[in-house]
């Protein structure tokens, strides 16, 4: 029982560290995407242990992972298209209003 609460707290601390990295590193798109994936991983750990603690089925965690993979693929496709058009992944090197 105490081990389960330790995992809850660990996943929340992981999420907070991911949020801090996301807020502090805003220059590169790749570091932003990595911090978002770290936050998603900590949410998955929290969700998995919560569903096991409440004796629910863990099918929802599979749906969550499916959508997380889709989010990661979309982020990587934006990164690749940005590197092809601008040559780097700096946010300061291009205008957001430009099509």
UniProtKB/Swiss-Prot annotation:
It catalyses: a ubiquinone + NADH + 5 H(+)(in) = a ubiquinol + NAD(+) + 4 H(+)(out). Pfam families: Oxidored_q2. Its EC number is 7.1.1.2. It is a multi-pass membrane protein. Keywords: Electron transport, Membrane, Mitochondrion, NAD, Respiratory chain, Translocase, Transmembrane, Transmembrane helix, Transport, Ubiquinone. GO terms for cellular component: mitochondrial membrane; respiratory chain complex I. It is found in: Mitochondrion membrane. It comes from the Eukaryota. InterPro entries: NADH_UbQ_OxRdtase_chain4L/K, NUOK/Mnh_C1-like. One of its GO terms (molecular function) is NADH dehydrogenase (ubiquinone) activity. The chain crosses the membrane at residues 4-24, 29-49, 63-83. Gene3D superfamilies: 1.10.287.3510. GO terms for biological process: ATP synthesis coupled electron transport. Belongs to the complex I subunit 4L family. Core subunit of the mitochondrial membrane respiratory chain NADH dehydrogenase (Complex I) that is believed to belong to the minimal assembly required for catalysis. Complex I functions in the transfer of electrons from NADH to the respiratory chain. The immediate electron acceptor for the enzyme is believed to be ubiquinone. This is NADH-ubiquinone oxidoreductase chain 4L.
